[in-house]
Amino acid sequence: LDYNKLLGRDPISTDLNTIQDYIKGKRILVTGGAGSIGSEIVRQLVKFGASTVTVFDNAEASMFHLEQEISRTFSKAHIKYVIGDVRDKYRLEEVFDSFKPNVVFHAAAYKHVPMMESNPVEAIKTNVLGTMNVSNIAYMNEVEKFIMVSTDKAVNPTNIMGATKRIAELYTQFLETKSATKFIVTRFGNVLGSEGSVIPTFIKQIERGGPVSVTHKEVIRYFMTIPEACQLVLQAGVLGNGGEVFLFDMGEPVSINDLAKNLIKHFKSKAKIEYIGLRPGEKLYEELLCDGENMVPTEDHNIMKLNHIDYDFKTLIPKIEKLSKIRSNDFYKILLLMKSIVPEFKRENND
């Protein structure tokens, strides 16, 4: 399956030499390193000559499979596989003490919108408090750069997952104001072929003979392939001087309805499309910029930098502390607290 043909565009290319020059010889930590994005970041870091890559993840099966693959492909790679959770700051402190990373790529997160609507406290624990743990320890250890993998769903969020990622973005920008560590945020859209994403889901439905579930005929999304997304994250890490939010040129948004039709045609299937309606927290289209943000070009034409927006960081920490103390899925209380941190957070398609 040619993903770029499916997207109707050429692959996005970036300057691999500048990435290699920066990565070579570095000690690097990748949180969520066994996931779809994290594992590809790990592969590319090994290719670019990182001296040591520490893979940190709580998914032991995925970690095992990655270890088996890497040992076959890169027999001399210096990789450490560490089971742990970003919620556990003591485990993270051990990792930083043991491996002393120069650079951190933070990819650990919960990403599934409907699942997080049902489990908002878990989204807060991982996406907000987990990011705080990793970034705080990076700050205390004076790590050179901290690159957070974020999402376009953090822009004017309409769901719990997007709101938690926006809060995490804000926290890293707060740390940037008082840190020697350069904190950098990267935002991109849906990643083709990642675990649980639309393409694998559609393919499974087609293999079963259908129906293929599309939420709405007019839904459009921005897409990138996994290698594209990871190379651009690495390049943004090279370009970043701290405090930036980087946005990638993902081409034109893609109709999910057309994507389903093209896949059915590709597999010569007779499966029908079933329109199931937008799920809680979903939009017809994703936005690229928060209110008040403007894009500025960088030296890489595939990457845009967003200007800073004013935010009262003095109020951020007390509000996050209140959020962290919620122990039950008290949806109304969670929504009110999140909206006090992210005023542009507006619910859609909910009771």
Please tell me what each predicted stretch does:
Residues 1-100:
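N-terminal Rossmann/SDR dinucleotide-binding element
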Residues 4, 13, 17-22, 170-191, ...:
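Strand-loop microenvironment adjacent to phosphate/nucleotide-handling motifs in alpha/beta enzyme folds
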Residues 31, 56, 104-108, 146-151, ...:
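SDR active-site strand-loop-helix element
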Residues 50, 96-105, 113, 143:
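Proline-aspartate-enriched helix->loop->beta-strand connector
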Residues 50-51, 141-145, 180-181:
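A short helix->loop->beta-strand "cap" motif at the edges of active sites that frequently abuts
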Residues 81, 123, 183-186:
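Hydrophobic/aromatic anchor residues within beta-strands of the central parallel beta-sheet
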Residues 82-83, 125, 216, 275:
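Conserved residues in the N-terminal Rossmann fold of short-chain dehydrogenase/reductase
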Residues 106, 110-169, 174-176:
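Conserved Rossmann-fold NAD(P)-dependent oxidoreductase catalytic core, especially the SDR/UDP-sugar
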